[in-house]
């Protein structure tokens, strides 16, 4: 008896269709799975035997051959378990209802329970593209799958429910389409908590308004980490398309829960400085997303930047330019997106007090140079804003004046982003930091005074072409905040001052 059931597979972020074909014939009793299955897929044989027993169904005493087509694509994980289970029932004629237009994804346990799997969102998105009408998923994945409209999602708790549904004894009801609630921002982390540091706050407002990378450097206790951790409170909300992109990455990484089936707030990732290269950029035998991809459409904060391994930091150079990470393995090449804001924070030396106005640095000059050399010139060049965070004065700490809240700063950020959205309509660009070189002159016009100042800055500072581009983009953002269509002299002057730290610390 031959039967075929639809399932889906996953390679990186990309889902692909899988046809589970079964042939039950006379011969020596055996149960084989072919079609490039990995070890987990092969182990499904024992899980399915036990699940059938839990449903009081005897496994056929016959030759059972399962083929996972296409046969030239590697199948990994427990995703096709439910489909294999249904194929066996169909092959045994235990169910008569047609399975055309249905797809099954989910792991089956020994007692017949259907267990949660990773990567449901991209697979359901593909099912909709393929015209599949109904997708049966584990109950714990149902909300995540129901984010996608245009396809009926059935939440399955156990194998018995499946059998009763397809025998017509007790029909499952499709899940309601899940509409994610509006993101509620965490007001416990507010810029109003940060005393003083008006210059650093202004710089981070510019970074948020244009999606720019920023490097914070200053002595211990000056508020670098405190400022960076409050950045999400002033970032604009995710669009639905951005939320889907971000959720896909978190879905395949197993970071979603039934309570949070879709990412509605911009990610904030802050890995420890002992992280490996694979942990930061992604990797493994089956390549998984790293921190740069998990921060996609959000913010990656690297605290104690100079404590990271230099080779690990250098891996960031290409992803920051290309906005994607490509990992090559024998089984294929996987690309993960990583459109991120990178915020780095570091001390200027091992003791932390180099350049401090009141405390003496105890580090020898060669130690300071060695510490700073962990941040290479090309990586430093990729930070649009270099922000010096000065020690907080007593007057600021003891002041009774209320600091500006994140909500007020966010209004200006949102206004600047609205200007950019209108400017970039139809271009695929979402913020000033993503302006491509071919569009730079067109989208960042300067008046004569600004152009003269830019030339002087370029010659005097010996800027690279990349640094020039980034100053121009930051100038564009400052002009947007200022409500100016043309970049003026004061906008260039303000942007240029954020490129001074490399001269102060690295090029003395």
Regions found by a protein language model. Give the residues of each.
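Peripheral, non-AAA+ core regions of ATP-driven protein-machinery
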Residues: 1-215, 222-225, 263, 328, ...
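Short beta-strand elements
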Residues: 18-24, 280, 384-387
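Conserved catalytic network of the ASCE P-loop NTPase/AAA+ motor domain
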Residues: 25, 56-59, 94-97, 129, ...
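Basic, amphipathic alpha-helical bundle interface domains used for macromolecular binding and assembly
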Residues: 40-45, 60, 67-77, 287, ...
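Conserved alpha-helical scaffold flanking the Walker A/P-loop in AAA+ ATPase domains
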Residues: 205, 262, 267, 277-300, ...
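Walker A/P-loop
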Residues: 216-257
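Conserved inter-motif catalytic segment of the P-loop NTP-binding fold
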Residues: 242-276, 283-284, 390, 430-439, ...
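Walker B catalytic acidic pair
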Residues: 297, 303-304, 315
């Amino acid at each position: 008896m031959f039967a075929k059931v639809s399932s889906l597979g996953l390679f990186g972020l990309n889902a692909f269709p899988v046809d589970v074909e079964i042939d039950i014939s006379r011969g020596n009793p055996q149960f084989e799975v072919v079609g490039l299955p990995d070890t987990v897929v092969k182990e499904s044989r024992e899980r399915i035997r036990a699940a059938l027993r839990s449903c009081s169904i005897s496994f056929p005493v016959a030759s059972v051959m399962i083929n996972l087509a296409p046969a030239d694509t590697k199948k990994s994980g427990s995703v096709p378990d439910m489909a294999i289970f249904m194929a066996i029932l169909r092959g045994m004629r235990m169910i008569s209802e047609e399975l055309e237009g249905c797809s099954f994804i989910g792991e089956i346990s020994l007692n017949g329970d259907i267990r949660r799997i990773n990567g449901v969102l991209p697979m359901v998105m593909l099912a909709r593209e393929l015209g599949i009408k109904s997708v049966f998923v584990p109950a714990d994945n149902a909300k995540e799958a129901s984010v996608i409209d245009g396809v009926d999602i059935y939440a399955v708790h156990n194998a018995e429910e499946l059998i009763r549904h397809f025998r017509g004894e007790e029909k499952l009801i499709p899940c309601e389409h899940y509409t994610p609630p509006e993101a509620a921002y965490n007001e416990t982390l507010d810029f109003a908590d940060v005393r003083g540091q008006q210059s650093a706050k202004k710089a981070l407002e510019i970074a948020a308004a244009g999606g720019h990378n920023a490097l914070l450097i200053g002595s211990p206790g000056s508020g670098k980490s405190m400022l960076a951790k409050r950045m999400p409170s002033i970032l604009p909300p995710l669009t639905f398309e951005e939320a889907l992109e971000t959720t896909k990455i978190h879905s395949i990484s197993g970071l979603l829960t039934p309570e949070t089936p879709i990412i509605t707030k911009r990610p904030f990732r802050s890995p420890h400085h002992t992280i490996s290269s694979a942990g930061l950029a992604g990797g493994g035998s089956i390549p998984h997303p790293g921190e740069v991809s998990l921060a996609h459409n959000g913010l990656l904060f690297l605290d104690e930047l100079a404590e990271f391994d230099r080779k690990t930091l250098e891996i960031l150079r290409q992803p920051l330019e290309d906005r994607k990470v490509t990992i090559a393995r024998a089984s294929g090449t996987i690309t993960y997106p990583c459109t991120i804001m990178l915020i780095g924070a570091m001390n200027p030396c091992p003791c932390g007090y180099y350049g401090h106005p009141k405390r003496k640095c105890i580090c020898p000059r060669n130690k300071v140079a060695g510490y700073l050399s962990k941040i290479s010139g090309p990586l430093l060049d990729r930070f649009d804003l270099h922000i010096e965070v000065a020690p907080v004065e007593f007057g600021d700490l003891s002041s009774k004046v209320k600091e500006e809240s994140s909500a007020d700063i966010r209004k200006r950020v949102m206004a600047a982003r609205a200007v950019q959205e209108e400017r970039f309509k139809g271009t695929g660009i979402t913020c000033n930091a993503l302006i491509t070189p071919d569009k730079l002159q067109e989208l960042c016009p300067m008046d004569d005074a600004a152009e003269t100042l830019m030339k002087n800055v370029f010659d005097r500072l010996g800027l690279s072409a990349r640094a020039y581009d980034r100053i121009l983009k930051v100038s564009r953002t400052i002009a947007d905040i200022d409500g100016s269509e043309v970049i003026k002299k004061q906008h260039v002057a303000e942007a240029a001052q954020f490129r001074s730290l490399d001269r102060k610390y690295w090029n003395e």
